[in-house]
């Protein structure tokens, strides 16, 4: 039988690391983030969750997955604000990280260097397949990367990218299933070709 002392538990809690969960829309990124954070809470770890204040699709003060699972969060405008609320936490979760400024990379490093487990979820590419916001740099410094996949709505294979259905060219357009669809590489290229022909 193994017995863990309180000192051992504290030491284990204070090992900082950065975990990034990325993929297309509808791939389960937020679902996985919520799962990990709820497990940490169950283990009596001190948890704080952040999301960009601009993301009010389902709730202003909760992180909510497309499957309606949710967890209370703190909406913020700047990544620097994360440091103000995190010094006494064991685990920090950050959803929709692609919408934060590039300073998020330094913030995550500082938190991890100070013994905090940081779990970040976000889109790795925008609808044009361009790496999105601070996510590429976070992937580079992460201790662990989990790439999750949606299912292509056209053929049923693993989705590779998010295709925007609406006509807007704005890079940031908060939307749902009426605005975006996950597609595999082949179906994505076919959709682009069709859009070009219809112009």
Curated annotation (Swiss-Prot):
Task: Give a Gene Ontology cellular component term annotated to this protein.
Answer: cytosol
Q: Any idea which positions bind Zn(2+)?
A: 152, 155, 184, 187
Q: Which family does it belong to?
A: Belongs to the thymidine kinase family.
Report which reactions are catalysed by this protein.
thymidine + ATP = dTMP + ADP + H(+)
- Subcellular locations according to the entry: Cytoplasm
Pfam families the UniProt entry points to: TK
SUPFAM superfamilies the UniProt entry points to? Glucocorticoid receptor-like (DNA-binding domain), P-loop containing nucleoside triphosphate hydrolases
Keyword Cytoplasm in annotation: yes
Query: Which residues does the entry assign to the active site, renumbered to this chain?
Result: 96 (proton acceptor)
* Native source species: Phocaeicola vulgatus (strain ATCC 8482 / DSM 1447 / JCM 5826 / CCUG 4940 / NBRC 14291 / NCTC 11154)
Quaternary structure, from the entry: Homotetramer.
* Residues that coordinate or bind ATP: 23-30, 95-98
* A GO biological-process term: thymidine metabolic process
Q: Which PANTHER family match?
A: THYMIDINE KINASE, THYMIDINE KINASE, CYTOSOLIC
**What protein name is recorded for this chain?**
Thymidine kinase
Its EC number(s): 2.7.1.21
A single GO molecular-function term is: zinc ion binding
Q: Which UniProt keywords apply?
A: ATP-binding, Cytoplasm, DNA synthesis, Kinase, Metal-binding, Nucleotide-binding, Transferase, Zinc
EC main class here is transferase
